[in-house]
Amino acid sequence: MREKHTILKTGLLLMGVMLALSTSAQKESIGEMFELAKMKSGMKNRRISSTDPTGGNRDHLEPFKPGEKRTIADIKGTGAINHIWITIAPPPNELSRNDIIIRMYWDGNEYPSVESPIGPFFGQGWDERYNYASLPLSVGPENGTGMSSYFTMPFEKGARVEIENQTGQTINAFYFYIDYLEMKQLPEDMGRFHAWYNHTLSEALPEGETEWALTGEQKPNTEEARNYVFIDTKGKGHFVGINYYVHSPTPMWYGEGDDMWFIDGEKSPSLIGTGTEDFFNTSWCPKEPFSHPHFGYPRVNNDVGWLGRTHVYRFFINDPIFFESAVKGTIETGHNNNLTLDLSTVAYWYQDAAVMLPEAPTKEQRKPKPFINHMDMHRWRDAWRKAKGNDPQLWGNE
């Protein structure tokens, strides 16, 4: 009898736990589409756009002169930007999006917490255009000219968005929407959005580019100091994504580099990856276009091996990387940083307060490198032939 009573009590306890969990799940989010049905209070939709104030159809800003900075949105009070759309003329092949800078300032700060060339921020590398689709960012038709962001960007004491024209040319037409929610107060625990562009031309090892041990011994990476840094900030927050733009001057695979994360002042990384393509949720040295809401390859090199430009992205929507006091995210440029790569990134994260970003690369520093072409390869072959004694029947793989 005592045993049956115990079983009954246990069964009732389990039923109670399951009922509590079920009730809790109903109160909490069941998914994004479920959230859409919930009624909201205390919010007003607001928009700033380039609409023609006369009611005409010239729905773009007056031309930006070379070197001009202009505030396109200066929002007072409390709220959250939840959508940005921009398109620009002339097109990217005539007016590089790599030299138009977008900055965002939160809560009356004099320093930006978002600073990036506008193309790389939205998902357009170099001076190119192509369609790109992810959950928080996209660049849509026609042929990669409609740039959109759906990142939530909260502010308590105002927000300001600034554009700077560093192209050396005139921006003839700049169209935009900035949609935001006006609120009396922000929900609890809302962080501030940050985005930082960085760039490097990495240096090969003194013994050369020894990837896959083809030209020399492949040594371990015992000193992470040479890793490329894509986020380096102090404070509490969480990392939510990266756009990664790599231009390789060699047909060799560029992606043996591992990601390494130093969280809250760690001397050694607590998170270490197994390869660049693995970090971006792919495998085996891919070079095929692919799009997923959280990761993808919108632009691949289409050349011999991995020579040329590749754009990869990953957003940590379900798996943010959290930090309490600091984070430094790095990645090798090839195994043990053995490769020369023209590499740039835009990192996206939230912090409990808007902070100042590291210094931004200059126009000259971020200037895209030219493509390696067939004539360059023939010069390589000529130097190789001479190094091999210039035998008249040298083929190329001796």
Q: Which stretches of residues belong to each language-model region?
A:
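Bacterial N-terminal signal peptides
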Residues: 10-20
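Sec/Tat signal peptide C-region and signal peptidase I cleavage site
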Residues: 21-25
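Bacterial N-terminal signal peptides that target proteins for export
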Residues: 2-12
